[in-house]
């Protein structure tokens, strides 16, 4: 069987070779038949077609994206060109630019002459307030008027003298402001004059000794108040300055805040204009000097700043010390840390302490023996005085061995704590003739020391 098939195949191969030669084809090396050649050629063509199709699809998919990006880029460039064109269109001519440059140069030079940083901050705050005020300005016509006024002011500032002169002007304005702030109001001046009249009558009637101390203290305060009045030339200067300020404020637009400032300046002007003339001030000062001299010659049972009560003098300190130093402080002025002898004295001292809202040491402790309270003069605490302890006191919490005035009663506390203190000593007796104290005091050119 195999032998019969092989000649058939050979015959078929010869037949195909003859047909190809008749058609003008040559047999290609590597291919045994036309059918094999045609079969491989179709596969190659399909592969090439698929590759070309895939490349075309990729290029087509990229084409719209590149077009949109290019379009957005062109739009951005166009917008930038439009903005640049508008900005260039807003520039003024070259001469205007030069004018702006020169103005900036002048401003830079002016800034270089500004004073220290603290002054710059004050100027900046003032400019901020001015900016807020300008924001409230009325219609355009008024703004133009203000602009013209500012132009004139700028020209005036350009004519100012050197920097030292400007500082002198600023200092003078500062002193003027301080002087105006110290002027007493009219009602205060009348009160001073009326008080002088009452004091003169009171000294002539020679009231009780405790009243004399009150009169002396009032005279001291009045003297200080009169001493703050400026001299007549200074008053005229203040009056002129206020007049100019009033005129300047009167030119401002009608705003509620500006009206309030104008009214305040009017009241200040009226108050300064009504100040007593210099001769009247001198008369008041001389009267005060005479009254003070007369009071100083009066018999005083207690030193100044001490309070008289039932034949004794009491001093409430203005500083604080511990209990032991308070005892020493009273001894240095010939007194002792207060020892209470009666219910009336206790009520008087408790009232003085509560009014001043101070915790003050008294001369009572149990340092010698715990629980046994003694005064600094060695006398024991009376059982009737135990009612003055606050509720729950004395409790000796943390070695509390010294007594103080606290609120409406007594309290024990640590002796090393700093508190106010109260001294007590006997009042002096006045044996001189009362007529001696009513003699008029000679006028003295210089006031006595306070």
Curated annotation (Swiss-Prot):
**What does the UniProt keyword field contain?**
Adaptive immunity, Calcium, Cell adhesion, Disulfide bond, Endocytosis, Glycoprotein, Immunity, Innate immunity, Lectin, Mannose-binding, Membrane, Metal-binding, Receptor, Repeat, Signal-anchor, Transmembrane, Transmembrane helix
9 X approximate tandem repeats: region residues: 96-303
By its UniProt entry, which SMART domains does this protein fall under? CLECT (SM00034)
Q: What is its main location?
A: membrane
Query: Where do transmembrane segments lie in this chain?
Result: 38-58
Residues bound to Ca(2+) are 393, 395, 397, 400, 411-412
The residue spans of each sequence repeat are 96-118, 119-141, 142-164, 165-187, 188-210, 211-233, 234-256, 257-279, 280-303
Q: Which PROSITE patterns match?
A: C_TYPE_LECTIN_1, C_TYPE_LECTIN_2
The residue spans the entry assigns to the Extracellular side of the membrane are as follows: 59-450
Quick one: a GO biological-process term for this protein? endocytosis
User: Could you list which ranges are Cytoplasmic topological domains?
Assistant: 1-37
Pfam families listed in its UniProt record: Lectin_C (PF00059)
Q: Which residues are glycosylated?
A: 80
> The organism sits in which domain of life?
Eukaryota
Q: Where in the cell is it found?
A: Membrane
Q: Name one GO cellular component term.
A: membrane
According to the UniProt record, which cysteines are disulfide-bonded?
A: 302-313, 330-423, 402-415
C-type lectin domain: from which residue to which, for each copy? 309-424
**Claim: Ribonucleoprotein is one of the keywords in the record:** no
Q: How does it assemble?
A: Homotetramer. Interacts with C1QBP; the interaction is indicative for a C1q:C1QBP:CD209 signaling complex. Interacts with ICAM2 and ICAM3 by binding to mannose-like carbohydrates. Interacts (via C-type lectin domain) with CEACAM1 (via Lewis X moieties); this interaction is regulated by the glycosylation pattern of CEACAM1 on cell types and regulates contact between dendritic cells and neutrophils.
Q: What is known of its domains?
A: The tandem repeat domain, also called neck domain, mediates oligomerization.
Q: What does this protein do?
A: Pathogen-recognition receptor expressed on the surface of immature dendritic cells (DCs) and involved in initiation of primary immune response. Thought to mediate the endocytosis of pathogens which are subsequently degraded in lysosomal compartments. The receptor returns to the cell membrane surface and the pathogen-derived antigens are presented to resting T-cells via MHC class II proteins to initiate the adaptive immune response. Probably recognizes in a calcium-dependent manner high mannose N-linked oligosaccharides in a variety of pathogen antigens. On DCs it is a high affinity receptor for ICAM2 and ICAM3 by binding to mannose-like carbohydrates. May act as a DC rolling receptor that mediates transendothelial migration of DC presursors from blood to tissues by binding endothelial ICAM2. Seems to regulate DC-induced T-cell proliferation by binding to ICAM3 on T-cells in the immunological synapse formed between DC and T-cells.
What is the protein's given name? CD209 antigen
Q: Which organism is it from?
A: Hylobates lar
């Amino acid at each position: 069987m195999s032998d019969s098939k092989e000649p058939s195949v050979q015959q078929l191969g010869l037949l195909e070779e003859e047909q190809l030669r008749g058609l003008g084809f040559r047999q290609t090396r590597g291919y045994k038949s036309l059918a094999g050649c045609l079969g491989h050629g179709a596969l190659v063509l399909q592969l090439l077609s698929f590759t070309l199709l895939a490349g075309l699809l990729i290029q087509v998919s990229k084409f719209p994206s590149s077009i949109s990006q290019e379009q957005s880029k062109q739009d951005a460039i166009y917008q930038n060109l439009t903005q640049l064109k508008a900005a260039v269109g807003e520039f003024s001519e070259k001469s205007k630019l030069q004018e702006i440059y020169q103005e900036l140069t002048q401003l830079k030079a002016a800034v270089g002459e500004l004073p220290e940083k603290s002054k710059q901050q004050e100027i900046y705050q003032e400019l901020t307030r001015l900016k807020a005020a300008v924001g409230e300005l009325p219609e355009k016509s008024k703004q133009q008027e203000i602009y013209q006024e500012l132009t004139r002011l700028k020209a005036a500032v350009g004519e100012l003298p050197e920097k030292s002169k400007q500082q002198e002007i600023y200092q003078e304005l500062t002193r003027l402001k301080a002087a105006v702030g110290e002027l007493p109001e009219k009602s205060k001046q009348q009160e001073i004059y009326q008080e002088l009249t009452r004091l003169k009558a009171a000294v002539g009637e020679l009231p009780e000794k405790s009243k004399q101390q009150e009169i002396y203290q009032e005279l001291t305060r009045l003297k200080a108040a009169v001493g703050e009045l400026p001299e007549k030339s200074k008053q005229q200067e203040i009056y002129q300055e206020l007049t100019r300020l009033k005129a300047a404020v009167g030119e401002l637009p009608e705003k509620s805040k500006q009206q309030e400032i104008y009214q305040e300046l009017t009241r200040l002007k009226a108050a300064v204009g009504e100040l007593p003339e210099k001769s009247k001030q001198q008369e008041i000062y001389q009267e005060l000097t005479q009254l003070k001299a007369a009071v100083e010659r009066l018999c005083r049972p207690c030193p100044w700043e001490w309070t008289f009560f039932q034949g004794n003098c009491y001093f409430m300190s203005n500083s604080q010390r511990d209990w032991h130093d308070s005892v020493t402080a009273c001894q240095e002025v010939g007194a002792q840390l207060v020892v209470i002898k009666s219910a009336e004295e206790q009520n008087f001292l408790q009232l003085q302490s509560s009014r001043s809202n101070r915790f003050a040491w008294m001369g009572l402790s149990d340092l010698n023996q715990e629980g046994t309270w003694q005064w600094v003069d060695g006398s024991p605490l009376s059982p009737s005085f135990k009612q003055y302890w606050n509720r729950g006191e004395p409790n000796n919490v943390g070695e509390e061995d010294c007594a103080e005035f606290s609120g409406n009663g007594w309290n024990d506390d640590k002796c090393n704590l700093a508190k106010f203190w109260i001294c007590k000593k006997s009042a002096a007796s006045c044996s001189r003739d009362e007529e001696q104290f009513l003699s008029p005091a000679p006028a003295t050119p210089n006031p006595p020391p306070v």
